[in-house]
Amino acid sequence: MKAIVKRRVEDKLYQNRYLVDPGRPHISVRKHLFPTPNLIALTQVCPAKCYQLNDRRQVIIVSDGCLECGTCNVLCGPDGDIEWTYPRGGFGVLFKFG
């Protein structure tokens, strides 16, 4: 009888690899004095936890671990709070399934 191995989401995400394009992030947050409610929501709903509030209460992004799932684009793209494009060819997330 095989033992059932339960794996956490974090363990599976750890298997992914990233090719970062230095100096060319594929996501940027529009400059703002006060973050919109949708930007604040991104700090909670981004599955890779790429969005954070800094010490000045500004939403910032660290896109190095981005899964390119598009959650942020759906939530904030139509309002112009973020600018989202696909990474250049050969860069971005490399999914490892299994």
UniProtKB/Swiss-Prot annotation:
| Span of the signal peptide | none
- State the taxonomy lineage: Bacteria, Pseudomonadati, Pseudomonadota, Alphaproteobacteria, Hyphomicrobiales
GO biological process annotations for this chain's record? Answer: nitrogen fixation
What's the protein here called? Ferredoxin-like protein
Give the species this sequence originates from. Answer: Rhizobium leguminosarum bv. trifolii
Explain the purpose of this protein: Could be a 3Fe-4S cluster-containing protein.
Which GO molecular function annotations are given, in alphabetical order?
A: iron ion binding; iron-sulfur cluster binding
Q: Superkingdom, according to UniProt?
A: Bacteria
Q: Does the keyword Electron transport apply?
A: yes
Write out the entry's keywords from A to Z.
Answer: Electron transport, Iron, Iron-sulfur, Metal-binding, Nitrogen fixation, Plasmid, Transport
Its family remark reads: To ferredoxins from P.putida and C.tartarivorum, ferredoxin I from A.vinelandii, ferredoxin II from D.desulfuricans.
